[in-house]
């Protein structure tokens, strides 16, 4: 199945008898490039994303691209969220996606980029099995994505990730000396995959939920993994007030540009 099935099954395998073997057979694009790889399984609890979970590597992962033919367009967009996130962390993958930005949902392209994505994430996980050090790069775009998701939950995970990358690219321009030309291209990739910025809930509500994110050291700050240059990221710590004000300003920027948020 998809990410939910993989998370529930993987967590059950990690807990039952203190851990039994698990085989992941992901059937969605998102699950193939992200959730089935890395051994991180979790469920939401008390209104917080992925609060209860475990790290346990699956025995095998079988990723078959023929499943893509069964997916509706929205499930493809969902998977593109994690694919473009990996592109923000890998210069080679970014160049591939940018060169083919007019056909991001093409089946042949997806079949070609899925192995690249799996290899990229597997290497990150090999070097940092838990959510410390290098593996923190995989949180890129996710703080804001999770905050919007918890606020209204009307979009898929990957759609929120695409929006989250756009917002956090804007934070990188403002607070992390991000390369404006590169970040504009990254935002264009995300918006192309989305078909435009979707309707999003009020920024003030999302900001309040972002301060509950487990990556934060205190409720008075928000920690983001932001893209700064091609293949480079940075951990950016903002005060809650900075984050809340920035989220509102960025949302207004897209609204003023004629894009509904």
Placement of each model-derived feature along the sequence:
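A glycine/threonine-rich phosphate-anchoring loop and its flanking beta-alpha core
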Residues: 10-102
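Short active-site segment of divalent metal-dependent hydrolases/proteases
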Residues: 5-6, 10, 145, 149
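C-terminal charged capping/lid subdomain of soluble metabolic enzymes
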Residues: 81-84, 177-261
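Catalytic-site beta-strand/loop segments enriched in glycine and acidic/polar residues
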Residues: 1-6, 141
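Active-site segments that bind and position negatively charged phosphate/pyrophosphate groups
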Residues: 96-204
């Amino acid at each position: 199945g998809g990410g939910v099935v993989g998370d529930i099954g993987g967590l059950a395998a990690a807990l039952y008898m203190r851990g039994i073997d698990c085989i992941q057979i992901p059937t969605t694009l998102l699950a193939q490039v992200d959730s089935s790889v890395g051994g991180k399984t979790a469920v939401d609890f008390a209104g917080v994303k992925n609060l209860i979970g475990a790290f346990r590597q699956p025995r095998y992962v079988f990723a078959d691209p023929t499943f893509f033919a069964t997916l509706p367009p929205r499930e493809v967009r969902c998977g593109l969220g994690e694919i473009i996130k990996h592109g923000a962390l890998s210069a080679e993958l970014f160049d591939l996606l940018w060169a083919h930005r007019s056909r991001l949902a093409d089946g042949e392209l997806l079949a070609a980029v899925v192995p690249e994505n799996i290899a990229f994430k597997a290497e990150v996980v090999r070097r940092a099995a838990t959510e410390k050090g290098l593996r923190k790069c995989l949180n890129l775009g996710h703080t804001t994505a999770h905050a919007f998701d918890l606020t209204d939950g009307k979009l898929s995970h990957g759609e929120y990730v695409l929006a989250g990358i756009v917002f956090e690219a804007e934070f990188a321009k403002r607070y992390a000396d991000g390369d404006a030309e590169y970040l504009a291209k990254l935002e264009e990739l995300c918006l192309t995959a989305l078909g435009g910025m979707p309707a999003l809930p009020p920024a003030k509500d999302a900001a309040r939920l972002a301060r509950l994110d487990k990556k934060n050291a205190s409720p008075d700050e928000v920690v983001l993994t932001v893209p700064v240059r091609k293949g480079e990221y940075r951990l950016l710590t903002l005060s809650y007030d900075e984050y809340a004000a920035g989220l509102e300003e960025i949302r207004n920027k897209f609204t003023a540009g004629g894009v509904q948020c």
